[in-house]
A protein has these predicted regions:
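Conserved ABC ATPase signature
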Residues: 33-37, 41
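Hydrophobic anchor residue at the start of the ABC signature
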Residues: 47
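Catalytic Walker B motif of ABC-type/P-loop ATPase nucleotide-binding domains
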Residues: 58-61
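H-loop/switch region of ABC-family ATPase nucleotide-binding domains
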Residues: 93-94
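Conserved ABC ATPase "signature" region
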Residues: 12-29
């Protein structure tokens, strides 16, 4: 009976490992030495290692650093699934576009203190300096558009109204 428990647990662990490998798309990296991985591949491998622990809270420092646009979308999908499972994700990032597109709440630290904390939308709309390129370019016409997607939607809506 005791060995049956271990066999079942081993199968569960293997299944979880396969799921994490697939989610983080690191299957082709498993036989490589960590020093041979690119920065983005190292980020994905590190995320996979952490996800195997099934954390309730994820503390991430610059998780998009070194990632291409395709994998940033994949990372956002992973974060969304984790949030649905009740995982809290706290990340520090200078990737304004990623934070604007996928963040729930954004805060700014200055001199060791949080000086503001708002919904991602309110944070980037109300900020002249720390905002997205899309918001800077379109704010005169569409002040509430923060992401490229929102600017495109606002343009399309405006065009239909003409």
């Amino acid at each position: 009976m005791f060995s049956g428990f271990h066999i079942q647990r081993k199968k569960e662990c293997e299944k979880q490992m396969e799921r994490v490998i697939e989610d983080t798309q690191i299957g082709h990296l498993l036989d490589m030495h960590p020093y041979d991985l690119s920065g983005g591949e190292q980020q994905r491998a590190a995320l996979a290692k952490v996800l195997l622990l099934e954390p309730e809270i994820l503390l991430l420092d610059e998780p998009t650093k070194g990632l291409d646009g395709f994998y940033k979308q994949k990372l956002a999908d992973i974060f969304e699934r984790l949030k649905k499972r009740g995982v809290t994700i706290l990340m520090v990032s200078h990737d304004i576009e990623f934070c604007a597109s996928y963040g729930d709440t954004c805060a700014m630290f200055f001199d060791g203190s949080v000086i503001t904390s708002q919904s991602a939308k309110a944070f980037f709309v109300g900020n002249s300096f720390y905002t997205t390129a899309a918001n800077r370019m379109a704010r005169q016409l569409y002040p509430d558009a923060v992401t490229v997607k929102e600017v495109i939607e606002a343009c399309s809506k405006n065009r239909r109204q003409e």
